[in-house]
UniProtKB/Swiss-Prot annotation:
Protein name, per record: Inner membrane-spanning protein YciB
Disulfide pairings: none
Gene Ontology cellular-component annotations: plasma membrane
Cellular location(s): Cell inner membrane
Top-level taxon in the UniProt lineage: Bacteria
Ranges that cross the membrane: 4-24, 25-45, 49-69, 76-96, 118-138, 150-170
Family: Belongs to the YciB family.
Organism whose genome encodes this protein: Rickettsia africae (strain ESF-5)
Membrane topology summary: Multi-pass membrane protein
A Pfam family this chain is assigned to: IspA
Coiled coil: none
Purpose of the protein: Plays a role in cell envelope biogenesis, maintenance of cell envelope integrity and membrane homeostasis.
Amino acid sequence: MLKLLSEIGPVIAFFAGFFYGGGIQHATLYMLITSVICITLCYVIDKKVSKLSIISTTVLLVSGSITLISGDSMYIKIKPTILYVIFGIIFLMSGIRKNPFIKYALESIVRLKEESWITLSYRTAAFFFFMAVVNEVVWRNCSDETWVKFKVFGVIPITFIFILLQLPLLLKNKLPDSKI
């Protein structure tokens, strides 16, 4: 539950900051503060923070700080693209190297045949590359308000749909001792 809150909390703070705090600058500040609080809580409570969370928070701190200092919202808008490309490369390379990163992230929930982990890695890489393109199209062609709404009401459902589309692979290839 803490992991979910640490992922969604900054998005909610960004949305609230944009619509109730006065625009992208406030939203960025709220998201930076919330992200630092969330990652700190994860470390204090769980005594660990995932590598993906560290990468995500680092990119956020850099792009968010540049946005706040420069006043240019482009930097916070390209943050998702940068993260999606980094994650896409991580999942793609781990699949190519036959050492699927996604296995380490999900193995406590589901146990799969090894070739299924590799397939899931490639699919996840493709999803992240797709999301990078979508983010670029939206932020470059839409208003700040539309981009913010897309981040909250578009990305979450698209991600959920992607996860649902993976269920047949997971259910077909799960090992007998799997939790799902």
